[in-house]
């Protein structure tokens, strides 16, 4: 899978690193397209006027205590930046619908860069090159969650990928894209 993005100011950054990361993410898009039948339902991909993204769930079969990762690889279009956490605007985020069977962990974000939005003379945290957000969830992490899992054969994981994008002159309206995965539950025979 693609690596997290490097930005100027990141230790070890070399000019051109963004192109390497972008190529890796583009290759991941192609690999996801080839593997779609094999992992049917585990990949959500979409293009908007601002970005391309692929959202992947790591497991199709889970049992109590299984920790899964939701990874979203995002490629902003040329001249576009996406707000990062720590700004007063709609930052890129994975938001999951509450589910009595899941424990949601803290998301992992790459380091953003500081961007001067000249029309407002405002410094904001953004992603302007390819980046990845990872959110882990655990199925049946507590006794109550395991009891709920025993009543089911399938587990739906639903939510949204939310973001707000801008170019050098315009901040576009926030976008919320639905995400949904259905995983099969494996119950222990003990």
Regions found by a protein language model. Name each.
Residues 6, 10-190:
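Extracellular/lumen-exposed scaffold segments
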């Amino acid at each position: 899978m693609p690596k997290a993005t490097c930005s100027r100011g990141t230790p070890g950054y070399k000019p051109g690193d963004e192109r390497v990361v972008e190529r890796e993410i583009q290759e991941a898009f192609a690999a996801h397209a080839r593997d779609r039948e094999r992992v049917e339902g585990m990949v959500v991909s979409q293009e908007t006027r601002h970005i391309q993204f692929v959202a992947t769930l790591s497991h199709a079969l889970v049992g109590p205590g299984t920790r899964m990762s939701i990874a979203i690889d995002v490629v902003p279009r040329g001249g576009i930046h996406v707000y990062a956490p720590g700004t007063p605007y709609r930052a890129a985020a994975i938001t999951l619908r509450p589910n009595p069977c899941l424990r949601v962990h803290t998301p992992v974000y790459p380091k953003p860069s500081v961007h001067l939005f000249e029309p407002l003379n405002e410094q904001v945290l953004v992603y302007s090159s390819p980046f990845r957000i990872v959110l882990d969830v655990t199925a049946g992490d507590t006794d109550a969650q395991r009891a709920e899992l025993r009543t089911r054969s399938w587990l739906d994981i639903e939510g949204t990928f939310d973001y707000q994008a801008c170019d050098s002159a315009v901040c576009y309206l926030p976008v919320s894209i639905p995400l949904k995965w259905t995983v099969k539950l494996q119950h222990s025979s003990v």
